[in-house]
């Protein structure tokens, strides 16, 4: 009878107890794995924020991890703001420098205009004095180049008169009479065609 009892199969009650004891053991490893994963993720987040050089390390780690789109957007926004600030600074510097250069150009133009007016005025005064010396006809309307050519011809005419000794000592002593006679002679010389021929050359 003892052999029959030992060799008898396990009762259903004992089998259910053993199965119920094994089921918690089987269910525990997955929960342990999940808890380990949660603990690892919490350790990673805590290590990124509170480790040595946490701010710098967290920034570098966030940039390296592909699964952080929020940090990438923040980086882009900060970079865009920095670029706009630098561009605004450049615009302010260029805007501050442009009025000075414009004022300098204006002053240079004004000074150049003043110098040009002074030069033109002095030149006109010199030609007016030269026209008073050269014997001219009432109908003459000489330009500046014609006045210079006429003055050169008048100097040449005076040289020829002095070389020919046509004037006596009495006429030479009276400057007014000599000037009138030379003016008349030069006018005749012009009317004869010498001036028109010389002006054409």
Swiss-Prot record:
Subcellular location: Nucleus
Domain bHLH residues, every copy: 107-158
Gene Ontology molecular function: DNA-binding transcription factor activity, RNA polymerase II-specific; protein dimerization activity; RNA polymerase II transcription regulatory region sequence-specific DNA binding
GO BP term, pick one: muscle organ development
Major location (coarse): nucleus
Biased composition (Basic residues): 34-43
Region (Disordered): 1-104
Biased composition (Low complexity): 1-18
Subunit structure: Efficient DNA binding requires dimerization with another bHLH protein. Homodimer or heterodimer with E proteins such as TCF3. ID1 binds preferentially to TCF3 but does not interact efficiently with TWIST1 so ID1 levels control the amount of TCF3 available to dimerize with TWIST and thus determine the type of dimer formed.
Function statement: Acts as a transcriptional regulator. Inhibits myogenesis by sequestrating E proteins, inhibiting trans-activation by MEF2, and inhibiting DNA-binding by MYOD1 through physical interaction. This interaction probably involves the basic domains of both proteins. Also represses expression of pro-inflammatory cytokines such as TNFA and IL1B. Regulates cranial suture patterning and fusion. Activates transcription as a heterodimer with E proteins. Regulates gene expression differentially, depending on dimer composition.
Protein name per UniProt: Twist-related protein 1
Species of the source: Macaca tonkeana (Tonkean macaque)
Gene behind the chain: TWIST1
């Amino acid at each position: 009878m003892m052999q029959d009892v030992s060799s008898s199969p396990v009762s259903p009650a004992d089998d259910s107890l053993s199965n119920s004891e094994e089921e918690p053991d089987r269910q525990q490893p997955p929960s342990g794995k999940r808890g380990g994963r949660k603990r690892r993720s919490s350790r990673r987040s805590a290590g990124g924020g509170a480790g040595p050089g946490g701010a710098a390390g967290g920034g570098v780690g966030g940039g390296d991890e592909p699964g952080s789109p929020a940090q990438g957007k923040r980086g882009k926004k900060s970079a865009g703001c920095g670029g706009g600030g630098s561009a605004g600074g450049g615009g302010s510097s260029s805007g501050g420098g442009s009025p000075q250069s414009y004022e300098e150009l204006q002053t240079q133009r004004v000074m150049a205009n003043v110098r040009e007016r002074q030069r033109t005025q002095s030149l006109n005064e010199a030609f007016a004095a030269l026209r008073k010396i050269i014997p001219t006809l009432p109908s003459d309307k000489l330009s500046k180049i014609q006045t210079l050519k006429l003055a050169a011809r008048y100097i040449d005419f005076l040289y020829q008169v002095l070389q020919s000794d046509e004037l006596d000592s009495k006429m030479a002593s009276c400057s007014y009479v000599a000037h009138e006679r030379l003016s008349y002679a030069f006018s005749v010389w012009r009317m004869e065609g010498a001036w028109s021929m010389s002006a054409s050359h």
